[in-house]
Regions:
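N-terminal glycine-/serine-/threonine-rich phosphate-binding loop
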Residues: 1-32, 110
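Short beta->alpha linker loops
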Residues: 7-8, 38, 104-107
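Ligand-binding beta-strand-loop-alpha-helix segment within the catalytic cores
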Residues: 56-130
């Protein structure tokens, strides 16, 4: 584990985006673990800027998100799938079929969680995980 101290949110976003993009350049078919919420928004903006400039290619990348709200489908504007589509996936050249968010509307949530764990294992694990830390101390 490596800790990087930064002076402000913009610097954090720039450094986090650079690390993620470096991972993609180093391993074009990498698996990224992604998070939602306000913490990663700046990072996602910086990634989108780099992608728009042609500095990084996400076409072979897979993503696995942390979580989803139970009872919300991906078209609901409060869902994490909607958040990711709006704030990152539609702004970079990632194959949407390689973006994974748990199904919050699954009939059997335990089976959905087990299938999601299997997906992570079948993907070879997560190469780089992005997490946020909230003001209340939560991580995720």
């Amino acid at each position: 584990m490596n800790f990087i101290k930064v002076n402000n949110y913009d610097e954090l976003s720039t450094k986090a985006a650079a690390l993620i993009c470096a991972q993609v350049v180093m391993k074009p078919n990498c698996v990224l673990g992604l998070a939602t919420g306000s913490s990663p928004l700046g990072t996602y903006e910086k990634i989108a800027e780099k992608c728009a400039k042609g500095e990084v290619d996400f076409s072979k990348v897979s993503s696995i998100n942390l979580d989803e709200y139970v009872g919300l489908d991906g078209t609901n504007d409060q869902s994490y799938r909607y958040f990711m589509n709006t704030n990152l996936f539609t702004k970079i050249n990632i194959d949407v079929t390689k973006t994974n968010v748990p199904n919050g509307c699954a009939a059997d949530l335990k089976a959905e969680c087990e299938a999601y764990d299997a997906l992570i294992a079948q993907s070879g694990g997560i190469d780089l995980q992005l997490l946020g830390i909230g003001l209340d101390g939560h991580i995720g």
